[in-house]
């Protein structure tokens, strides 16, 4: 089976808790290789553009404000069924509904400050990866 790529963002709340290493360990234990990574402080323009699909939703402004509230860790994960596998280990969007042992159950505080973002489809993964990384930044692992 071909390996997929997916985008993951460790959000400002989880970065502030210093759990990046613990989250990376979960990716690797699930068979997801990190093939690109960077820490950055998103600008308002970047966050608005990245989450443009949600622009008409009532939570858009709060989402953007949260995503620019502190640094984020952005990584590209590679592995078999990477999109689905990453979403499984992230857990439900609302941490109160997330299964025990998932990233959100263990590290998220609320549906807004929910620790991580993960691509929800191969198509969105390709778009999201291209938003943050140039092709030459992806390492072959």
UniProtKB/Swiss-Prot annotation:
Superkingdom classification of source: Bacteria
Which reaction is recorded as catalysed by this protein?
a 2'-deoxyribonucleoside 5'-diphosphate + ATP = a 2'-deoxyribonucleoside 5'-triphosphate + ADP; a ribonucleoside 5'-diphosphate + ATP = a ribonucleoside 5'-triphosphate + ADP
Tell me one GO biological process term. Answer: GTP biosynthetic process
State the needed cofactors, names only. Answer: Mg(2+)
UniProt keywords, alphabetically: ATP-binding, Cytoplasm, Kinase, Magnesium, Metal-binding, Nucleotide metabolism, Nucleotide-binding, Phosphoprotein, Transferase
| Mitochondrion recorded as keyword | no
Database matches in SMART domains: NDK (SM00562)
Which terms does the record give in the GO molecular function aspect? Answer: ATP binding; metal ion binding; nucleoside diphosphate kinase activity
Alphabetized Pfam families for the sequence: NDK (PF00334)
Subcellular location(s): the record lists: Cytoplasm
Protein family:
Belongs to the NDK family.
Record's PANTHER family? NUCLEOSIDE DIPHOSPHATE KINASE (PTHR46161), NUCLEOSIDE DIPHOSPHATE KINASE DDB_G0292928-RELATED (PTHR46161:SF3)
Query: What's the name of the protein?
Result: Nucleoside diphosphate kinase
Identify the taxonomic lineage of the organism of origin.
Bacteria, Pseudomonadati, Pseudomonadota, Gammaproteobacteria, Legionellales
